[in-house]
Amino acid sequence: MYFVGLVKFKKLQTKDVVAENLRRIKAEEAKEGIKVHGIYWTLGSYDSVAIFEAPDEKIAMKMAIRRAEDMDMKTLVAVPMEEAMKLLE
């Protein structure tokens, strides 16, 4: 399943904070089957957007809960356009 995470940072983002968060995410990827397709810092209502795959909603939720100390994350389920188009048939 694909997910989009809309992130607001709670802490000042330093190189050390970012490096530690990336280390944790990579460990989760290996352990829980999460695959991060991209992390982008953004301007506007959210500080960052993450696009990732997880085996199911529960694993995606666990990832968001683990990050709760450092960031607020709204997680959206994303359906690839090709799959959504099939629903129109």
What do these predicted regions represent?
Residues V36-I39, M73-T75:
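Generic structural signal for residues in well-ordered beta-strands
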Residues M1-A30, K35, T42-Y46, V79-E89:
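Short S/T/G/P-rich N-terminal loop/turn motif that feeds into the first structured element of a domain
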Residues V4-V7, Y40-A64:
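Short, well-ordered beta-strand segments in beta-rich or mixed alpha/beta enzyme
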Residues E53-E83:
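An amphipathic, aromatic/His-enriched active-site/gating alpha helix that lines ligand/cofactor pockets
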